[in-house]
Design a protein with these regions (language model features):
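Alpha-helical transmembrane segments
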Residues: 15-29, 57, 59-62, 95-104, 131, 155, 192-197, ...
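Terminal transmembrane helical anchor/hairpin motif
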Residues: 35-43, 141-211
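Aromatic- and glycine-rich beta-strand/loop motifs that create alpha-glucan
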Residues: 1-23, 137
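Hydrophobic alpha-helical transmembrane segments
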Residues: 17-22, 92, 120-121, 148-149, ...
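Secretory targeting signals
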Residues: 32-69, 90-152
């Protein structure tokens, strides 16, 4: 699996840097700009929470999308299903790699605001939902474009839903829940992630038969 991912991602060249630049250039610059406006630590805290919830979930599926594109749309992709039909383990490795990539950023954040570890845990669940959404729609529709659009539309809609306070749809919140409150908040998203991952596995299983 690791060897497959290596060769699949090697082909995208410089685009491999997009998640790194997003996490360690784009988001910190937005945070610095927010802090520079008034040197207010409370405003910086809110900006960190907002920016991470907007950009981290999208960046988390960057490698996933390219691996899916290779498995679904590349010529001769039927050879990839001879030994290992289920591609979820490869996608989960991409997911775990992103969580590790995210750790240094949150080590800095929690040095300033200790409770932001709860935001990291929240993002781990939300990013699993994004993985499930990308996986399910890609194998269901057999088109990476549709999968990308589904991810982008959900990301945009969740921010818009938060502005009108639609409960159960949006994870985009300024307040970071902790402990049992966070668990209750994340249960619907975790269940949705599980359903989509199962649906993705089913569509993935039948994908070679439909070619």
């Amino acid at each position: 699996n690791l060897k497959n991912i290596y060769w699949q991602l090697k082909g995208i060249g410089i685009f491999n840097l997009a998640p790194v630049l997003g996490l360690y250039v784009l988001i910190p610059l937005a945070n610095l700009a927010a802090y520079g406006m008034g040197h207010d630590m409370d405003y910086l805290y809110v900006n960190i929470v907002k920016q991470c919830q907007i950009f981290c979930p999208i960046l988390s599926v960057w490698y996933v999308i390219f691996v899916l594109e290779h498995c679904i749309e590349e010529p001769g992709n039927e050879l990839l299903y001879i030994r290992h039909r289920n591609k979820l383990p490869e996608l989960l490795l991409c997911y775990l790699a992103f969580q590790i990539l995210l750790l240094p950023l949150f080590a800095v954040y929690t040095g300033m605001f200790p409770d932001l570890w709860w935001l990291y845990l929240k993002l781990c669940v939300i990013q699993l939902l994004y993985l499930g959404l990308a996986y399910f729609t890609a194998f269901l529709c057999r088109k990476i474009t549709i999968s990308v659009l589904a991810v982008l539309c959900y990301s945009i809609s969740t921010v818009m839903a938060a502005t009108i306070e639609v409960q159960g749809i949006s994870y985009y919140k300024v307040i970071v829940n902790q402990g049992a409150d966070l668990v209750r908040e994340l249960i619907p998203f975790a269940l949705a992630a599980g359903v989509m991952l199962i649906g993705g596995c089913i569509c993935n299983y039948y994908f070679p038969m439909r070619k």
